[in-house]
Amino acid sequence: MRYLILISGFMFCGMSLFAQARKDTTNSVKIIQTYKPTLIEARKIETLPVIEKPKPAAPNYTYNIEPKKVKTDKTVSNIPAADLYKTEEFNYPSSFVKVGYGNMKTPLAEFYLNNKRDNKYSYGLQYRFLQTNSELNKTFADFTTHHVKGYLASYSTTGEFGLEASYKQNKFNYYGYKDTSKIAEKNLGRTISNFEAKAYFNSVSDKSNKIKHRTAFNFYNYQIGKAIENDYAISSKIYGNVSDFNDLENGILSATIGFDYTTFQHLNQKSLNRIFLTFDPRFDFKYDVLNVSAGLNTTVYFNGSDTAQPFINPFIKVTYPLIENIATVYGGVDGRYKKQSLKSIIQTNQFTSNYNLTNIYENIKLFAGITAKVGSSADAVFEINYSDVTNMPLFISTQDSFNSFTIINDQANILKFTAAFNYSFSEIARIGFTGNFYNYNFKTQPQPWQLPTIEAKVNMNFNIKNKVYPHFDLMAMSLQKQRTGLSETNYSTNTINAFYDISAGIDFRFRPKLSLFVQANNIMATRYQRWYNYPVLGFNAIGGLTFIF
């Protein structure tokens, strides 16, 4: 009933409502301006969205552990020894005697006496004798050598002090003489005597900020025939660490200072006295990944007068790790004024009779290369360098009855490429190769007389069960051009053929202190010529025993 009354009331109220009071439906609208919506300027997002996994924050606990002292009783007892098989300690040998005999009536004797391993001292005495008695070139190709050497060194916390002395004598002949000259046969013999002595001290220190040095005094008396040369030299390298600054690290500042006094006397000629002063400062450091060494090579030359001739060359070497611990590239600049001496001439060509002591000046040397290493078993190096050399020595044959050599000097530009490779398989096998390739360009000489354009060496060493030790060596040189005659307008030339020399040997240790050795040289038995008209000995072999004590 109440719902009916409520509905009737709504109907009655609705009858009195109107939508609008006006009955006129005509309306007018005045437009003031066009409507323009205001929008935010659009901007392109340049980065891609990154979806990151939410990282929950680590809970931060505020509880504390109350410390509590725990009483412990220390118990000291001996550590029991391990039950191992006890073996006798092996004392490595340092002394031995070696005797042998060869197919060219070649006696060999060697004696090496050295102290055992010691942390305070080392000393020793060595002697070697070798002689040939062949029938080659009417026995004039034979030789006799004696070599004795002694040394003493002491080691302490301050450094190493040592003394060395040696004497070597070599008797041989001008066996490349003309067969028709009977007078020459009476005067073919030559004897080289060389006495050397050295005293040195190398300081050591475990303090990085302490200055250290390596100082040595050297003397030698070198004589061949009537030519005598004496040399007195002292040199010292002083070096120390430099604190890092800016981006430079591992700095080492050093300087090598040297004094060299040389005298030369030949027959009745006036003695030639020369002084060489050297000063080579260096600064080695690391910048980022580069290792740099920079400095100067300085030589001041006095030729017996008061006039001093200075020669200064820059030195720079930079290395860069191309591949970490595998490959490194390097390059730089070098150059130096070098002393020519009787000793260096004869050690290069012992058949020289006219001694031209004109010094050599390497004006500049540019070099670049790469070193590579594969693990601990193989390494290699490849280098190319260019040198500009003043007074480059060249050996030419004289026209005397001995067929001896003399030296002429010329300006030279030399391009050299070197390749070297070494491989080792544990102690079982070791193989090495070295090759040099040259391109010469001389100012006045048409050929690089007696200089090869290619030379190579290969060596192999093997270890078979620590009892048999074979080894193999190969040496090769390309053809060479030779000149006979001092006149620049009237001389003859020849070609020295390319050659290779193969040598092999074996050491068989059939007892712990006794071994058998065999060494064979020039296995191909080719009497090639390193120096014009001086063929080497043919096939020669020596065998014998070595006793270790």
Region roles according to the model:
Residues 92, 97-100, 128, 291-295, ...:
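Exposed, low-structure sequence patches enriched in small/polar residues
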Residues 18-87:
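N-terminal periplasmic/intermembrane-space "pro-region" immediately following the signal or transit peptide
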Residues 189-200, 216-288:
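Outer-membrane beta-barrel transmembrane domain signature of Gram-negative proteins
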Residues 114-134, 249-262, 272-303, 426-437:
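Surface-exposed extracellular loop regions of Gram-negative outer-membrane beta-barrel proteins
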Residues 111, 148-150, 197-201, 232-240, ...:
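Membrane-embedded beta-strands of outer-membrane beta-barrel proteins
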Residues 77-81, 88-97, 101-148, 159:
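Outer-membrane beta-barrel translocator/receptor signature
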Residues 132-149, 164-212, 216-231:
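Flexible loop and strand-edge segments within Gram-negative outer membrane beta-barrel domains
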Residues 85-92, 117-120, 155-160, 204-211, ...:
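Short loop/turn motifs that connect adjacent beta-strands in outer-membrane beta-barrel proteins
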